[in-house]
């Protein structure tokens, strides 16, 4: 029988999607079911059908999974924030680790055996609740029945239901800090008593759109920012009196956003009481066991600052990235997509020089301020797209006859991953190590494939759970210049007795220096050897032979081949 919409189907959930939907198969279709977890046997109702897959709504759990737990939040099924709260936390970690593993194999093209060998255990949370230092609550209204039976409107705050803009009223999200509830409920009282209207997305009328709350976990300082569809809040003095009395609140501001847009924050921020920014401190931990090192970096955070929302896991994430960078104090490092300089300032504590690049000008201003506040003078920041700033730097340095290389390049791109031009320039600069911090393992796998095809070897992979009870996972990866066992080792000293006349005219080092100066390219001894053979220059019998008969050798790219030939002509070798 042909399946159709509204049909009931029996499913056993065998896997989960990246968005946390349960995946099961029926009648040749793969179905995605919200609120179902691995191991559940369910009855679901078909809601949408495509050619080979479809979506279904959970109707009944026939046999619950051994990994199913009682979710502590009564709103988790309605709210779009927690997709997998009903799954045991250990199983959540396994699911996320498998997600990274499978993407590296399926998209990256790496062998499962290889990834299994280099992948380190996922870094989970000690407490997977109350971890968010920032929350943006939409403000709306709903009809309620009064004591006399009449209907009236009341203002509400909460979160949007999944894939909608319908507000689920909830002032105590279990992922947020406990102070959120008192602040929200106090703010709603202020709105009710002073007849402050809530913004209506359909009519674009009403004043209050969102309430942003941020907390510095280390400092205890709390910032409250009201996003309004106007220029001023009524009775600001009353709001200040109410909120300033809440423990920890040190900053009250207004964000003006009159645009008909889904963007939450407006560009203009006005502080109405207290500080313009709050402070927080991120500790630098030992990257091996996350023990204390006694070192840290302090950050000033504004309502618009990009700052990781889980500070406890951020310490582990960035300390791991710092450990992978392998800094000894003499390195030049580039930090691409640097935000307010969180990773940059970590790196600057261990490197000789750090260059940070970020497209958001306000973030770069914050980065520079944070560097000054921490007494860091070896970090320099640039406003612009990574795919424009890095290539521009490279081309200018090469044109001036200077080395355009870096010892380490760190990237922490958005979900779409690194731009192709950015990856191309990284390959041209040939850093000794590349550290990739990713928030999307699918685009990570795609980019790693490009970097490894360009001469890098994947050395370490480790997932970090930044967002418990959601389908999202961060990943830190280390790549180094390719020197696996099945590639040849090259000696720099030549046996003069075995040299041909052509070989004696220039050493490999001289050829490399010429190519770097004239073409801005770094070439390996292997590439030079391959081009020399093509040009009829006979090498010594034992030179550049692989260690084993089935060893793979990378072939010289066309641009580097032309540059090497130019060098050979320059030295009169061809």
Protein language model regions, located:
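Carbohydrate-binding surface patches
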Residues: 212-216, 222-232
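Terminal RNA-binding accessory module
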Residues: 1-75, 380-381, 388
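Extended interfacial segments that mediate partner engagement and assembly in macromolecular machines
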Residues: 59-71, 77-198, 233
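Short Lys/Arg-enriched helix C-cap and helix-to-coil transition segments
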Residues: 539-549
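Short, acidic/hydrophobic/Gly-rich beta-strand patch recurrent on exposed beta strands
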Residues: 22-27, 156-161, 225-227, 367
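DNA-recognition alpha helix
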Residues: 507-519, 529-535
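Rossmann-like S-adenosyl-L-methionine
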Residues: 2-10, 18, 231-503, 508-509
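Phospho-regulated, low-complexity intrinsically disordered regions of nuclear gene-regulatory
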Residues: 505, 553-574
């Amino acid at each position: 029988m042909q399946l159709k919409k509204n049909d009931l189907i029996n499913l056993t959930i065998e896997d989960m999607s990246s968005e946390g939907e349960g995946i099961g198969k029926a009648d040749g279709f793969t179905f995605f079911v919200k609120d179902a977890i691995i191991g559940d046997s369910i009855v679901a109702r078909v809601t949408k059908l495509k050619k080979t897959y479809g979506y279904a709504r959970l109707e009944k759990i026939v046999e619950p999974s051994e990994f199913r737990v009682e979710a502590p939040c009564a709103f988790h099924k309605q709210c779009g924030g927690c997709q997998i709260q009903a799954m045991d936390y250990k199983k959540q970690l396994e699911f996320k680790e498998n997600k990274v593993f499978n993407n590296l194999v399926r998209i990256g093209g790496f062998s499962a055996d290889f990834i299994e060998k280099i992948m380190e255990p996922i870094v989970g949370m000690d407490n997977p609740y109350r971890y968010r230092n920032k929350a943006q609550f939409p403000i709306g209204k709903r009809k309620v029945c009064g004591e006399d039976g009449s209907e009236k409107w009341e203002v509400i705050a909460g979160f949007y239901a999944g894939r909608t803009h319908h507000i689920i009223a909830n002032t105590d999200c279990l992922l947020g800090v406990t102070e959120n509830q008192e602040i929200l409920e106090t703010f709603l009282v202020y709105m009710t008593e002073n007849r402050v209207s809530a913004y209506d997305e359909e009519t674009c009328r009403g004043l209050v759109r969102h309430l942003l709350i941020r907390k510095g976990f280390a400092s205890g300082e709390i910032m409250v920012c009201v996003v309004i569809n106007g220029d001023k809040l009524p009775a600001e003095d009353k709001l200040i009196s109410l909120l300033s009395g809440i423990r920890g609140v040190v900053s009250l501001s207004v964000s003006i956003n009159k645009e008909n847009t889904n963007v939450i924050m407006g560009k203009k921020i006005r502080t109405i009481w207290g500080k313009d920014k709050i402070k927080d401190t991120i500790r630098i931990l030992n990257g091996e066991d996350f023990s204390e090192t006694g070192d840290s970096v302090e950050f000033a955070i504004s309502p618009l600052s990009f700052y990781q929302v889980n500070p406890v896991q951020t310490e582990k994430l960035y300390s791991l990235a710092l450990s992978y960078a392998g800094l000894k104090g003499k390195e030049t490092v580039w930090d691409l997509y640097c935000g307010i300089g969180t990773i940059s300032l970590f790196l600057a504590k261990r490197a000789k020089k750090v260059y940070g690049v970020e497209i958001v000008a306000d973030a770069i201003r914050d980065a520079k301020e944070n560097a000054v506040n921490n007494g860091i003078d070896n970090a320099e920041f640039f406003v612009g797209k990574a795919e424009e700033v890095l290539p521009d730097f490279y081309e200018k340095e090469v044109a001036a006859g200077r080395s355009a290389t870096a010892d380490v390049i760190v990237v922490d791109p958005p979900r779409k991953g690194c731009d192709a031009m950015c990856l191309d320039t990284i390959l041209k600069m040939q850093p000794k190590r590349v550290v990739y911090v990713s928030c999307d393992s699918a685009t990570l796998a795609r980019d790693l494939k490009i970097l490894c095809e360009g001469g890098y070897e994947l050395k370490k992979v480790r997932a970090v759970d930044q967002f418990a009870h959601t389908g999202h996972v961060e990943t830190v990866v280390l790549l180094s210049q390719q020197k696996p066992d099945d590639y040849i080792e090259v000696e720099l000293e030549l046996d003069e007795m075995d040299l041909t006349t052509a070989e004696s005219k220039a050493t490999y080092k001289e050829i490399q220096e010429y190519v770097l100066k004239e073409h801005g390219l770094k070439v390996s001894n292997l590439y030079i050897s391959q081009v020399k053979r093509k040009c009829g220059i006979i090498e010594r019998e034992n030179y550049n032979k692989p260690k084993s008969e089935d060893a793979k050798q990378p072939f010289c790219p066309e641009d580097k081949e032309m540059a090497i030939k130019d060098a050979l002509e320059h030295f009169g070798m061809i």
